[in-house]
């Protein structure tokens, strides 16, 4: 049984490819999801993707992952700077996670520099564009522990 990865994308990431392409690039979220799934499969893992613009929906999906997922890759979008609820959900389920950002948040507005997730993440990927998803999926597939079988 291969590792199971949950890919979560937060608010406005459904607009990737058309939203500020000079910052976020031209790759769409469906393209990112398709390539992430294919890469996970090539490494013997499975990947499920979830996107929501709503904080509570993301919290619910993280809670549903408890006991069913080996690792989470999360691009929290703007919730990076505001969501204690998503942070608490990630800590409550005790699933290691990678925090991912398409743009280099540290080269942008000062308020984007703070993250509620970075101090608890197993790793942080910033500024690599859509390629960052491949790096994150590969790291989870090759380095995270597989959950114990029942």
Swiss-Prot record:
Record keywords, A-Z: Lyase, Quinate metabolism
PROSITE patterns: DEHYDROQUINASE_II
GO BP annotation list: 3,4-dihydroxybenzoate biosynthetic process; quinate catabolic process
Positions marked as site (Transition state stabilizer): 19
Recorded catalytic activity of this chain's protein: 3-dehydroquinate = 3-dehydroshikimate + H2O
Pathway participation: Aromatic compound metabolism; 3,4-dihydroxybenzoate biosynthesis; 3,4-dihydroxybenzoate from 3-dehydroquinate: step 1/2
Residues at which substrate binds: 75, 81, 88, 102-103, 112
Pfam families with a match to the protein in the record: DHquinase_II
Active site: 24 (proton acceptor), 101 (proton donor)
Functional description taken from the UniProt entry: Is involved in the catabolism of quinate. Allows the utilization of quinate as carbon source via the beta-ketoadipate pathway.
Similarity remark: Belongs to the type-II 3-dehydroquinase family.
Assembly mode: Homododecamer. Adopts a ring-like structure, composed of an arrangement of two hexameric rings stacked on top of one another.
Protein name: Catabolic 3-dehydroquinase
Species: Aspergillus clavatus (strain ATCC 1007 / CBS 513.65 / DSM 816 / NCTC 3887 / NRRL 1 / QM 1276 / 107)
Lineage, broadest ranks: Eukaryota, Fungi, Dikarya, Ascomycota, Pezizomycotina
């Amino acid at each position: 049984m291969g590792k199971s990865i949950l890919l979560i994308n937060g608010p406005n990431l459904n607009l990737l490819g058309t939203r500020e392409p000079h910052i976020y690039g031209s790759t769409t979220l469906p393209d990112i999801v398709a390539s992430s799934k294919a890469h996970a499969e090539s490494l013997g893992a499975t990947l499920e993707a979830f996107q929501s613009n709503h904080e509570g929906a993301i919290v619910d999906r993280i809670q549903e992952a408890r006991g069913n997922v080996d690792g989470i890759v999360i691009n929290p979008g703007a919730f990076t700077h505001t969501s204690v609820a998503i942070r608490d959900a990630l800590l409550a389920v005790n699933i290691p996670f990678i925090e991912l950002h398409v743009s280099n948040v540290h080269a942008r507005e000062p308020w984007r520099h703070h993250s509620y997730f970075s101090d608890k993440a197993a790793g942080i990927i910033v500024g690599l564009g859509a390629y960052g998803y491949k790096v994150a999926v590969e790291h989870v597939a090759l380095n995270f522990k597989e959950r114990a079988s029942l």
